[in-house]
Every structure is written in structure tokens, then in C-alpha cells.
Design a protein with these regions (language model features):
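Polytopic transmembrane helical bundles with strong interfacial aromatic enrichment
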Residues: 1-154
Length: 154
């Protein structure tokens, strides 16, 4: 039952995270408004929660060996590709995370959406978000290949 629960939570987090990062990017491409800012903040929060759940369940599944022994993953090039995509996603998230925290503080202090949401950085964060979504899809492709036995010698 643990194996099923972890796998389900892992995939739910993946789906929520993918939808949230796309929604964040879409909201940040809109003209500055209270609604766009609220949607961007909400999507960003879901993206963060989903990422913690996704990474947490993934590590648990890996280290506990609930699917395959950890050694299977360590020698599989598709696992290495997956981890590479994850590291890129995390690296791309640093600047947007810091910027969105700053914007949240400014909004909480009563700043007008036009003053809080700087259009240039918002467009860049939107682009980063869409690149991150693509990297998530590439992670899924690598995971499917790995789960089907590709990357290991028979």
C-alpha cells in the first residue's frame, strides 16, 4: 500500500506542479493587475508545494527502494538525465523565487499591482516558467524510458 500511495502522490505532485508553473507563466504575461498578481502568487505557491511533495516522494521512492533497488537508478543514464533536468529546473527557480518573494512583500505592504509587478522581470519569469514546464515534460520522458528498462544492459 505504501508503494501505491507514494507513486500516486508523486504523480499528483507532478501534475499539480506542471499546471501551476504553466499558470504562473501565463499570469505573468498578462498586463499588471490585482487579478494577475493574485493568480501568479497562487500558482507560484502551488508550484512550490508540488515541488516539495514531488521531490520528497521521489527521494523516498528512490532511497527506500519501493520500485527498484537504488543501484538500478544510479547506473541508468535516463535517471541521470532526469536528475539533470531537475537540477536545471531548480537552478532556473532561484531568481523567480526571490523576485516573487519581494513582490509578495510589496503587495502585502499595500503596493499597487502596477508598482509591484515589474513588466520586464515578469516576462522573464514567465519565460523561465515555460522552460521549466518543458523540462518537467522531458523528465517524464526520461522516467518513462527508465521505467521501461531502457538504459540498462541485459
Amino acid at each position: 500500500m505504501l508503494r501505491l500511495t507514494l507513486a500516486a502522490l508523486h504523480l499528483i505532485a507532478l501534475g499539480l506542479g506542471l499546471g501551476a508553473v504553466l499558470a504562473r507563466g501565463t499570469a505573468l504575461r498578462e498586463p499588471p493587475s490585482a487579478g494577475a498578481l493574485r493568480r501568479a502568487f497562487r500558482a507560484d505557491a502551488v508550484w512550490g508545494i508540488a515541488a516539495v511533495l514531488w521531490i520528497g516522494t521521489g527521494l523516498w521512492r528512490l532511497l527506500a527502494g519501493t520500485e527498484k533497488a537504488p543501484g538500478y537508478y544510479y547506473v541508468n543514464p535516463y535517471f541521470h538525465a532526469k536528475m539533470g533536468f531537475l537540477l536545471l529546473i531548480l537552478a532556473l527557480e532561484v531568481w523567480p523565487m526571490v523576485t516573487l518573494i519581494r513582490w509578495r512583500r510589496a503587495a502585502a505592504a499595500g503596493g499597487a499591482p502596477e508598482a509591484v509587478l515589474d513588466a520586464g522581470p515578469a516576462r522573464r519569469i514567465a519565460t523561465f516558467s515555460h522552460v521549466q514546464a518543458l523540462l518537467v515534460v522531458l523528465m517524464v520522458c526520461a522516467a518513462v524510458a527508465m521505467a521501461r528498462g531502457y538504459g540498462v544492459r541485459s
